[in-house]
């Protein structure tokens, strides 16, 4: 029987190189591949693709969810390099950790405007 084994969110950005730099230099991802208008970054078992777009409406409406072991540790790590003032910050920012119907999470907005939610796995 066939078994699905993973999925890769595709984030969008008007500046792919700048987005890759943010995810790698500030958030600890590694470059998997980088083309002119498409890239992949990896951290642990998570891969994110970044695709070029011309219209800012696309990244402003892109959402993804990533499940995490060690949510509190990840939040502490990233809060040293990303603003935690999500509502007032105009660039990259994170929300505080909060409880949602699907679990504890925080959201991160990257420089392109993508919003990625990081959710604690149940054993956290």
Swiss-Prot record:
CDD domains: BLMA_like (cd08349). One of its GO terms (biological process) is response to antibiotic. The keyword GTP-binding does not apply. SUPFAM superfamilies: Glyoxalase/Bleomycin resistance protein/Dihydroxybiphenyl dioxygenase. It comes from the Bacteria. Binding protein with a strong affinity to the bleomycin family of antibiotics. This is Bleomycin resistance protein. Belongs to the bleomycin resistance protein family. Residues 3-121 form the VOC domain. The gene is ble. Gene3D superfamilies: 2,3-Dihydroxybiphenyl 1,2-Dioxygenase, domain 1. Homodimer. Keywords: Antibiotic resistance. It holds the Pfam family Glyoxalase_7.
